[in-house]
């Protein structure tokens, strides 16, 4: 009889299928030679793990509390990983520039796990982070599922969410939920960063047709039985009887867009948010090209976009 952890299919380095859930976690890496950032992988449940990043802490900075960001990567709900090298490098540079703790979520992907699995996984990760509030290092003796970096350095008065593309869509839906449900310990989300948020909103622009078709294809793959289809409230915040954006669960928001086919969609989302009566602070960043900060971080545009987002953290 096969053991429960047996590999039943292996096509290295791309696919490995096991009989039980498995996370290919890395050993902790301390003081990255390029950035000084430390990171480690932490499983928080049988379905979800996170990679936690800590900036270099000098002797005179010990005891200083740092902002906490929960990061959700993009790629159509069905591709990539929080552990992918380009996301990893991107987050390291962000951590260095922002001087913040980042918790990057490794969530389940479609089509193996249809939505709303990813939404639930990221909410679970956020609640896990919130569960550290008010703890000290003595709690680690009885709470093996808690992380000392978050306890020792995390400032829960400065908790942010951050996502790009479909990751930004997940963050948007978390903000809707956080406006209705409490986080553990009464923790509040201060702000959120939405880079190129992924929505299905009908526009009158012919330029948006291609992007809308592509977005619809990914949505159908990720959530084939979505109630309301393309007008599901999770993907179309402007739909009839849509979500109450007035209740967004944060007080500050940075929305980034670029001059591409999705720009009109983002503008309609921003308009809906402004008309909703949400009382928070809205900051809009308009750039020339997308994903330079991830795929070309050493270019001037990539650096400018990184600085723009990290300057939002305070």
UniProtKB/Swiss-Prot annotation:
It is an enzyme of class 4 (lyase). GO terms for biological process: alkaloid metabolic process. Its EC number is 4.-.-.-. InterPro entries: AB_hydrolase_3, AB_hydrolase_fold, Carboxylest/Gibb_receptor. A motif (Involved in the stabilization of the negatively charged intermediate by the formation of the oxyanion hole) lies at residues 73-75. The active site is at residues 165, 260. It comes from the Eukaryota. Pathway: Alkaloid biosynthesis. Keywords: Alkaloid metabolism, Lyase. One of its GO terms (molecular function) is hydrolase activity. Belongs to the 'GDXG' lipolytic enzyme family. Component of the seco-iridoid and derivatives monoterpenoid indole alkaloids (MIAs, e.g. vincadifformine) biosynthesis pathway. Catalyzes the conversion of O-acetylstemmadenine (OAS) to vincadifformine. May also trigger the formation of additional unknown MIAs. This is Hydrolase 4. It comes from Catharanthus roseus (Madagascar periwinkle).
